[in-house]
C-alpha cells in the first residue's frame, strides 16, 4: 500500500510596510496591509525577512521625496541577496513618476498610484504570475470609497483613522497634492458611519477623520451633506467617544463648524488650521484665498466659542519673493495667535506646481535662518503653553504603555497633548482624570486621580 504524501501548508510570506508622509498615507498603508494579509501575507517588522516590501511615499516636499529615493537605493543590495523579493512603491511619488520609477530603479517591481491601493492584492499576484514589472495609475479608485471586506484585519487600536474624502480643488501654487491625489471626492456618509461603528465595536474610542480639506466634505455627493452635518450624524448614530479631524482650510472654516466645538461634546477641543504665511502678499501668491486678518478673525471666533481649544498650524518660510517684512509679518502672527504647536517648513519647488516657475527665489541660507528663528520662537510658546497646564486636571484617553518609562501609561487630552503617568494596571482604552504635575517641551507628566469604572 502506498501512503499518499501529507499535504503541507505553504510557507508564510512576509510583508514589510514603510510609510513616509501624512496620516492619509498611514491610512492607505494600513489598508494595503489589511488587503494583503487577507490573501495570506503576514506582517513583519524586520525588513530582512520580507518577501514583499510595500513603500508608501510622499512628495509634498523635496526632502520627503529625497528620503524615498535614498531608501529605495538601499534596497538594491537587499534585492540582490533575495532575488524573489518584490518591491512595491505606492503613494504620491508613485503617482508623480509612474513608469519613471521603474526606469530609475530597476529593482522595483510594482508602482501603484494614489488611486490604486484597492487593487494591491491582484496587482501583486499579476507581477508574481507574469514576472513583469507593472505601473498601475488608474484615473479613479475602481473600488470607490467602500469599507474593505477585510477591515477586521489590523483593528483593535484605541485610536483609528477613517478617510472621509480624497483630493483637493484648491490648487495652492506651492502644493503638488491636487496633481497626485486628484480632485475632491467625498465618501458616502453611510459608509463612513458603518466603518466608525465597526471600529468602535473593535475597541476604538477615538477616530481621526482624514481628508486633504475636510471642510469641503460632501460637495459632489448625490445627496450633498456638509461636514458639520456629518459630525452630528457621527455623534447620533455611532458609539465612538471622541472625534478629531484633519486637515482644514481656513477659507472653508464655516461658522457652523466653529460652533460644533461648543455644541458637540465628543468633538475634541483641538483644530489644525494651516495659515502658511502672515503676509497678505505671499498668501495671494500662494492662492490661499484669505488674508491674515481673516485668518485671525476665525481664530478669535474659535476661542470665543471654545476657550479651551488648542490650535496647531503649518507655515512655510522662504516662498518665492518673500521679503524680510513678509517674514516678520509671519512671526507677528505666530506671536499674536500663540499656537499650541506648529509644523514649519522651508519652501521647496515641487514639480507640476505654479510656484516652481515663480521668479525671485529666496536663497537657501536665508530660508535656513528664517526657519531656525521661527522654530525657536514657537518652541518657547509651546513650552509656556505646556507649563500653563500644570495643576489642571484633564480627561485623558489612555493609548497604551508609555515608551518613556516602565510602569507608565500614555494618552492624550482632548487638546491633543501627550501625558505620561504612573499606573499599576493597564488602562488602555479608558478615559481617566489625570492631574498635570510637570510640563516639558513635547509632553506632560501627570498623576492618575482615580481608576475608571466599566463605562469609562
Swiss-Prot record:
Keyword Methyltransferase recorded: no
Cofactor binding comment, as recorded: Binds 2 [4Fe-4S] clusters. One cluster is coordinated with 3 cysteines and an exchangeable S-adenosyl-L-methionine.
SUPFAM superfamilies with a match to the protein in the record: Radical SAM enzymes
Boundaries of every Radical SAM core domain copy: 154-384
InterPro entries: Elp3/MiaA/NifB-like_rSAM (IPR006638), Methylthiotransferase (IPR005839), Methylthiotransferase_CS (IPR020612), Methylthiotransferase_N (IPR013848), Methylthiotransferase_N_sf (IPR038135), MiaB_methiolase (IPR006463), rSAM (IPR007197), rSAM_horseshoe (IPR023404)
Cofactors, names only: [4Fe-4S] cluster
Domain TRAM span(s) in chain numbering: 387-450
A GO MF term: metal ion binding
Alphabetically ordered keywords of this record: 4Fe-4S, Cytoplasm, Iron, Iron-sulfur, Metal-binding, S-adenosyl-L-methionine, Transferase, tRNA processing
Superkingdom of origin organism: Bacteria
Domain MTTase N-terminal: residue ranges: 13-129
Name of a matching Pfam family: TRAM
Oligomer and partners: Monomer.
Family, as annotated: Belongs to the methylthiotransferase family. MiaB subfamily.
Protein name, entry field: tRNA-2-methylthio-N(6)-dimethylallyladenosine synthase
Organism placement in taxonomy: Bacteria, Pseudomonadati, Thermodesulfobacteriota, Syntrophobacteria, Syntrophobacterales
Amino acid at each position: 500500500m502506498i501512503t499518499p504524501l501529507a499535504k503541507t501548508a505553504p510557507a508564510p510570506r512576509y510583508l514589510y510596510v514603510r510609510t513616509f508622509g501624512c496620516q492619509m498615507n498611514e491610512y492607505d498603508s494600513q489598508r494595503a496591509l489589511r488587503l494583503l494579509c487577507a490573501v495570506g501575507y503576514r506582517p513583519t517588522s524586520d525588513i530582512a525577512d520580507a518577501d514583499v516590501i510595500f513603500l508608501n511615499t510622499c512628495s509634498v516636499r523635496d526632502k520627503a521625496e529625497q528620503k524615498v529615493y535614498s531608501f529605495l537605493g538601499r534596497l538594491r543590495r537587499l534585492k540582490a541577496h533575495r532575488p524573489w523579493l518584490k518591491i512595491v512603491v505606492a503613494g504620491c511619488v508613485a503617482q508623480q513618476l509612474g513608469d519613471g520609477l521603474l526606469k530609475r530603479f530597476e529593482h522595483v517591481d510594482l508602482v501603484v498610484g494614489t488611486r490604486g491601493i484597492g487593487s494591491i492584492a491582484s496587482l501583486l499576484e499579476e507581477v508574481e504570475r507574469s514576472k513583469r514589472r507593472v505601473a498601475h495609475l488608474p484615473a479613479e479608485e475602481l473600488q470607490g470609497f467602500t469599507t474593505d471586506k477585510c477591515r477586521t484585519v489590523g483593528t483593535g487600536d484605541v485610536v483609528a483613522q477613517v478617510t472621509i474624502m480624497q483630493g483637493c480643488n484648491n490648487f495652492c501654487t506651492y502644493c503638488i497634492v491636487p496633481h497626485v491625489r486628484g480632485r475632491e471626492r467625498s465618501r458616502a456618509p453611510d459608509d463612513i458611519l458603518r466603518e466608525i461603528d465597526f471600529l468602535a465595536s473593535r475597541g476604538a474610542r477615538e477616530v481621526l477623520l482624514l481628508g486633504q480639506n475636510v471642510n469641503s466634505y460632501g460637495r459632489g455627493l448625490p445627496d450633498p451633506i456638509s461636514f458639520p452635518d456629518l459630525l452630528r450624524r457621527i455623534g447620533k448614530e455611532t458609539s465612538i467617544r471622541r472625534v478629531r479631524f484633519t486637515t482644514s482650510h481656513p477659507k472653508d472654516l464655516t461658522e457652523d463648524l466653529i460652533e460644533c466645538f461648543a455644541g458637540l461634546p465628543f468633538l475634541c477641543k483641538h483644530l489644525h488650521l494651516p495659515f502658511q504665511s502672515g503676509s497678505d502678499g505671499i498668501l495671494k501668491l500662494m492662492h490661499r484665498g484669505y488674508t491674515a486678518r481673516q485668518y485671525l478673525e476665525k481664530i478669535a471666533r474659535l476661542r470665543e466659542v471654545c476657550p479651551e481649544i488648542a490650535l496647531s498650524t503649518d507655515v512655510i518660510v522662504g516662498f518665492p519673493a518673500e521679503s524680510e517684512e513678509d517674514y516678520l509679518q509671519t512671526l507677528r502672527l505666530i506671536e499674536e495667535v500663540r499656537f499650541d504647536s506648529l509644523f514649519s517648513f522651508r519652501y521647496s519647488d515641487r514639480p507640476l506646481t505654479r510656484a516652481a516657475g515663480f521668479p525671485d527665489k529666496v536663497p537657501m541660507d536665508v530660508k535656513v535662518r528664517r526657519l531656525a528663528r521661527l522654530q525657536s520662537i514657537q518652541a518657547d510658546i509651546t513650552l509656556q503653553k505646556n507649563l500653563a497646564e500644570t495643576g489642571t486636571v484633564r480627561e485623558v484617553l489612555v493609548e497604551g504603555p508609555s515608551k518613556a518609562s516602565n510602569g507608565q501609561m500614555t494618552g492624550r487630552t482632548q487638546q491633543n497633548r501627550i501625558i505620561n503617568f504612573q499606573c499599576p494596571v493597564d488602562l488602555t482604552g479608558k478615559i481617566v482624570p489625570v492631574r498635570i504635575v510637570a510640563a516639558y517641551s513635547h509632553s506632560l507628566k501627570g498623576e492618575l486621580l482615580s481608576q475608571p469604572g466599566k463605562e469609562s
